[in-house]
């Protein structure tokens, strides 16, 4: 599905990002894994290479526009082009009522989850324009569609990612670049796995499928949207949510 494509993943050291990188490689892409967690990112790249794929790891601070430019330049230097990018890196931030958030707790989440995606998208677009286009998938959230108490910076950032995605699609569709967003619900990541059993059971009950999702289930959707099989699909938000938003 992605044979001979070059794909870049941010936040690829673990969880959903790692699953996306692995599925990209399984489908034939050469993968650039990026993260600020060097051991985890290198482990993801090693997993892909040991399985017969081709991957490299590059460190990335998503809040640095210069670092994004360095990573994309190195990707093009090593592989000749950039066909696919998945902007996945993000944090949940602190859980507080909106009135209790500080400028610092707000800015940290917005800088990583929204501005970091903008820095990535901007740099990725400019690389893709040189080779005739590509596909960008931004990882949003179910909270890019609805609210949730005590996490307003995250909700605001993810709504922003959905809006940014639509604008990129409108601006660059005629130039061969597609851009979509994927909104996971609660997924079996390290954060969720470490929650008490009663909390995880409650989270499971909020989904129509009555379970928490697997990272690979999100990754399969991302890989399909990244591929030429989704050639007429752009500017859209896709929930990988087990029916959470059907409530």
What residue ranges belong to the model's regions?
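Active-site helix of classical SDR
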Residues: 121, 157, 165
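Short C-terminal tail/terminal secondary-structure segment
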Residues: 92-95, 146, 206, 223, ...
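Alpha-helical segment proximal to the catalytic Tyr-Lys
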Residues: 126, 170-174, 231
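A conserved structural motif in NAD(P)-dependent oxidoreductases
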Residues: 207-218, 229
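Substrate-binding pocket helix/loop in short-chain dehydrogenase/reductase
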Residues: 96-98, 102-110, 192, 203
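Residue(s) in the substrate-gating loop at a strand-loop-helix junction
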Residues: 141
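The beta1-alpha1 cofactor-binding region of Rossmann-like NAD(H)/NADP(H)-dependent oxidoreductases
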Residues: 38-39, 59-70, 103, 216-217
């Amino acid at each position: 599905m992605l044979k001979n494509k070059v794909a870049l993943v941010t936040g690829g050291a673990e969880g959903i990002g790692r699953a996306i990188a692995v599925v990209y490689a399984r489908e034939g892409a050469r993968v650039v894994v990026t993260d600020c967690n060097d051991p985890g990112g290198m482990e993801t790249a090693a997993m892909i290479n040991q399985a017969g794929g081709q991957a490299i790891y590059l460190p990335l601070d998503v809040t640095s526009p210069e670092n994004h430019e360095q990573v994309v330049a190195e990707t093009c230097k090593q592989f000749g082009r950039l066909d696919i990018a998945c902007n996945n890196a993000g944090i949940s931030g602190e859980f507080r009522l909106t009135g209790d958030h500080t400028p610092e707790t707000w800015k940290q989440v917005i800088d990583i989850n929204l501005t970091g995606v903008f820095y990535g998208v901007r740099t990725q677009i400019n690389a893709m324009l040189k080779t005739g286009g590509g596909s960008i998938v931004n990882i949003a959230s179910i909270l890019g569609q609805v609210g949730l108490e005590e996490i307003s910076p995250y909700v605001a950032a993810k709504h922003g990612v959905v809006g940014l995605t639509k604008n990129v699609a409108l601006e660059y569709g005629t130039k061969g670049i597609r851009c979509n967003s994927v909104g996971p619900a609660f997924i079996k990541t390290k954060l969720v796995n470490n929650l008490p059993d009663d909390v995880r059971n409650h989270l499971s009950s909020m989904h129509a499928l009555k379970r928490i999702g697997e990272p690979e289930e999100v990754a399969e959707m991302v890989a399909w949207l990244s591929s030429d099989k989704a050639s007429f699909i752009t500017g859209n938000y896709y929930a990988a949510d087990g029916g959470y938003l059907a409530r």
